[in-house]
């Protein structure tokens, strides 16, 4: 019996667990339409702010041998642009599974106001609150401040009743996994997305003896193969600490079907692709779908649930 990638996530059924990562190939309606027409099981919009943002000066994204470095600074078309798109798509494609919608305000108040707009709208998809952008100068990553994270979630869940996930930065200490999981378990979160890019890396052009991205004197978020072990560790750490009702979306270092399998084995329910999607474009989803099926067939698995989260210890 051939492997099935059918994925149940919340109350939705997707053909496979593959998605784009917010920020990649989702800036415009054209790119979003291309995602919708691809073999991705689901897709997510660009992280939006209240108003349109140009982001950081270029060059701000560079592909490097094992991944990427970026300091985009949240360029986007503004929340109304993306909300109009998803509402129209709901109307014209009523039988499609839920769309993911990402927001990343510059302040608590901005996030609250955007989430109120989503709550008051007819959007019936899944919202992702990005608490982990490392590339806005002068703006720390919210999710490294545990008290502030709790303050935001307290305010959000006073009024937000639709499915909500949060995107987290990578953590590197067991105490931090424990603290953050303890906070998140207090709320009716739909999911946690781990990880955003590893913040403030530095990549050097030896020939020019210079950095390769302009913002922040060359410091930027690292993605791709460099971050896969960190991403897998975060997926596993939260999978084993969070309430079973809080699902995991695994992001970081996915280049092959084997990488997808590893994220699922660590406990992810869905996975998002960023760096490699930039390099290959939307045909990557067809390749990853095929390669994941090949891995599963070789191992004798017919469904993802047969192995998801069942990582063996020594």
UniProtKB/Swiss-Prot annotation:
Keyword set, alphabetical order: Cytoplasm, Flavoprotein, FMN, Oxidoreductase, Pyrimidine biosynthesis
Q: Binding positions for FMN?
A: 46-47, 130, 167, 195, 224, 252-253, 274-275
- Organism domain of life: Eukaryota
Identify which cofactors the protein needs according to its UniProt entry.
FMN
What does the record note about the cofactor?
Answer: Binds 1 FMN per subunit.
* Active site (record annotation): 132-133
Q: Does the keyword Transcription apply?
A: no
Q: Report the catalytic activity.
A: (S)-dihydroorotate + fumarate = orotate + succinate
What residues does substrate bind to? 46, 70-74, 130, 196-197
Where is it localised?
Cytoplasm
Q: Which family does it belong to?
A: Belongs to the dihydroorotate dehydrogenase family. Type 1 subfamily.
Stated role: Catalyzes the conversion of dihydroorotate to orotate with fumarate as the electron acceptor.
> Quaternary state and partners of this protein?
Homodimer.
Q: What is this protein called?
A: Dihydroorotate dehydrogenase (fumarate)
Q: Which gene encodes it?
A: URA1
């Amino acid at each position: 019996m051939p492997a099935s990638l059918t994925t149940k996530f919340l109350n939705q059924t997707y053909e496979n667990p593959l998605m784009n990562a917010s920020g990649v190939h989702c800036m415009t309606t054209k790119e979003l339409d291309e995602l919708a027409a691809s073999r991705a099981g689901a897709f997510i919009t660009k992280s939006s702010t209240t108003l349109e943002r140009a982001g950081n000066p270029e060059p701000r994204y560079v592909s490097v041998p094992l991944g990427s470095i970026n300091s985009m600074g949240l360029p986007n078309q503004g929340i109304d642009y993306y909300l109009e798109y998803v509402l129209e798509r709901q109307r014209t494609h009523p039988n499609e599974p839920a769309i993911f919608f990402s927001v990343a305000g510059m302040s608590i108040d901005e996030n609250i106001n955007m989430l109120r707009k989503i709550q008051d709208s007819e959007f019936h998809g899944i919202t992702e609150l990005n608490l982990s952008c490392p590339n806005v100068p002068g703006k720390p990553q919210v999710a490294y401040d545990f008290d502030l994270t709790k303050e935001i979630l307290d305010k959000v869940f006073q009024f937000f009743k639709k499915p909500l996930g949060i995107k987290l930065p990578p953590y590197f200490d067991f105490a931090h996994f424990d603290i953050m999981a303890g906070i998140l378990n207090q709320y009716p979160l739909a999911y946690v997305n781990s990880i955003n890019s590893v913040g403030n890396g530095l990549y050097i052009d030896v020939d020019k003896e210079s950095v390769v991205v302009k913002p922040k004197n060359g410091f930027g978020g690292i993605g791709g193969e460099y971050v896969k072990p960190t991403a897998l560790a975060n997926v596993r750490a939260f999978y084993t600490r969070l309430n079973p009702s809080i699902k995991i979306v695994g992001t970081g270092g996915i280049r092959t079907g084997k990488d997808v399998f590893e994220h699922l084995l660590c406990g992810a329910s869905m996975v998002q692709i960023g760096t490699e999607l930039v390099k290959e474009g939307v045909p990557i989803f067809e390749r990853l779908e095929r390669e994941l099926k090949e891995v599963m067939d070789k191992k004798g698995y017919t469904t993802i649930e047969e192995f998801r989260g069942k990582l063996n210890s020594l």
